[in-house]
Curated annotation (Swiss-Prot):
Keywords: Elongation factor, Protein biosynthesis. Gene3D superfamilies: 3.30.70.60. HAMAP family: EF1_beta. One of its GO terms (molecular function) is translation elongation factor activity. SMART domains: EF1_GNE. This is Elongation factor 1-beta. It comes from the Archaea. CDD domains: EF1B. Belongs to the EF-1-beta/EF-1-delta family. Promotes the exchange of GDP for GTP in EF-1-alpha/GDP, thus allowing the regeneration of EF-1-alpha/GTP that could then be used to form the ternary complex EF-1-alpha/GTP/AAtRNA. The keyword DNA-binding does not apply.
């Protein structure tokens, strides 16, 4: 099997959320089977900034589910959504 790079958009609950603390929580919550790559900030509107988590996983059953579930459980997270997946060559 190969590897897949995935992008997970993480929406904070409000513009008042401490993004640096949330970034640290995201890195700490990464499942063992997922390899952290980077986090990019994406301005949305009215001061709200989404975090795009880019990570690498093995291409297999379950895929991104464990990472999605781990991020959805974090405090100050309103929603999570996979926005991109690509197979690495």
């Amino acid at each position: 099997m190969g590897e897949v790079v995935a992008t997970l958009k993480i929406m904070p609950e409000s513009p008042d959320v401490d993004l640096e603390a949330l970034k640290a929580a995201i890195q700490a919550a990464m499942p063992a089977e997922a390899e952290f790559h980077k986090i990019e900030e994406e301005p949305i509107a009215f001061g709200l900034v989404a975090l795009n988590l880019i990570f690498i996983i093995e291409d297999g059953e379950g895929g991104t589910e464990s990472t999605e579930e781990a991020m959805a459980k974090l405090a100050d997270v309103a929603s999570v959504e996979i926005t991109d997946t690509r197979r690495l060559m």
